[in-house]
């Protein structure tokens, strides 16, 4: 399984709004920082008053490093690069904090009680982060959480090019990629392999005639194929969808399209995470399915 590539130059600029526009991260990180301060101060006082489990200190230091790292990856917009690291890191932090809670919760004194309360809260936040960063952005829970973000849902980590879209095969073309770049995605009319099922053996002498999107002869985009005296009309974009959020296409994927919130799109191939779509201006490309909703 391949993963999408990101441009370092486009993704490495510091922008704090990447963090502040995500209420889930702001809320959980704030709770974690307050919990860490409580646990740290309680641990200092408990250590002064008497014996204190020394391994807890390393757990608190490791937790602090992870807490500092999280806002950094958001501000530089490189979260997708470090999802695996975040999942593993917070899993380790969860083990440390739960172990510290076990040692502290049964100890007497108000200081150890405060420290145990802090590490218990940290354990809860760590577990939430493990589930969140360990899940794909297209999962139902992540989509629900990201729906509160001002930037909208995040991209799925599954590559749209290799895993979601059917590729049109041309027996006269030497390369599928070349056909894709020079034929399908330069606003030329094309037909997917799904639509051509059973019609692949059209001879060179047969004619292929395409009807424009806004043609008065058809309500939707259609393709007329004349093969052996047979007329067949196929609607390439039979569905209509409305954009739920603004979407800016990735600079590294020329097959994507940008669109604005509430824009109406014509789509097909709705059984995957990335849909083939056509804008009103005739631009054709792919869009993430969690950014749009079908209206007919």
Swiss-Prot record:
One GO term of the biological process aspect: regulation of actin filament polymerization
Superkingdom of the organism of origin: Eukaryota
Transmembrane regions: 24-44, 55-77, 84-106, 111-131
SMART domains in the record: SH3 (SM00326)
Pfam families xref list: SH3_1 (PF00018)
Protein's membrane topology: Multi-pass membrane protein
Key words of the record: Cell membrane, Membrane, SH3 domain, Stress response, Transmembrane, Transmembrane helix
Record domain SH3: where: 236-296
Protein location: Cell membrane
Topological domains, Extracellular: 45-54, 107-110
Residue ranges annotated as Cytoplasmic topological domain: 1-23, 78-83, 132-296
InterPro entries with a match to the protein in the record: SH3-like_dom_sf, SH3_domain, Sho1_SH3
Gene3D superfamilies per UniProt: SH3 Domains (2.30.30.40)
Record keyword Kinase present: no
A GO CC term assigned to this protein in UniProt: plasma membrane
CDD domains: SH3_Sho1p
Subunit text: Forms homooligomers.
Record's function text: Plasma membrane osmosensor that activates the high osmolarity glycerol (HOG) MAPK signaling pathway in response to high osmolarity.
Stated family: Belongs to the SHO1 family.
Protein's name according to its UniProt entry: High osmolarity signaling protein SHO1
Gene name of the encoded protein: SHO1
């Amino acid at each position: 399984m391949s993963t999408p590539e990101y441009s370092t130059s486009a993704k490495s600029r510091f922008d704090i709004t990447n963090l502040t526009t995500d209420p889930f991260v702001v809320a959980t990180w704030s709770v974690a920082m307050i919990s860490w301060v409580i646990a740290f101060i309680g641990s200092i006082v408990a250590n002064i008053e008497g014996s204190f489990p020394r391994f807890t200190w390393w757990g608190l230091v490791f937790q602090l490093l992870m807490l500092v790292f999280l806002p950094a990856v958001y501000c530089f917009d490189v979260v997708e690069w470090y999802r695996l690291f975040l999942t593993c890191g917070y899993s380790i932090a969860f083990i440390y904090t739960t172990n510290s809670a076990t040692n502290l919760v049964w100890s007497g004194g108000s200081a150890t009680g405060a420290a145990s309360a802090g590490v218990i809260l940290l354990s809860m936040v760590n577990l939430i982060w493990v589930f969140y960063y360990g899940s794909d952005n297209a999962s139902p829970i992540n989509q629900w959480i990201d729906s509160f973000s001002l930037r909208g849902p995040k991209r799925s980590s599954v590559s749209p090019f290799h895993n979601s879209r059917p590729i049109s095969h041309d027996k006269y073309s030497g390369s599928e990629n070349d056909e894709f770049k020079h034929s399908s995605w330069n606003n030329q009319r094309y037909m997917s392999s799904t639509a051509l099922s059973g019609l692949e053996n059209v001879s060179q002498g047969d004619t292929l005639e395409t009807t424009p999107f806004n043609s008065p002869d058809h309500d939707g985009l259609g393709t007329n194929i004349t093969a052996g005296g047979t007329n067949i009309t196929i609607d390439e974009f039979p569905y209509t969808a409305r954009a739920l959020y603004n979407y800016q296409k990735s600079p590294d994927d020329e097959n994507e399209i940008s669109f604005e919130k509430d824009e109406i799109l014509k789509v097909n191939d709705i059984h995957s995470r990335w849909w083939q779509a056509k804008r009103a201006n005739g631009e054709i490309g792919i869009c993430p399915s969690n950014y749009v909703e079908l209206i007919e």
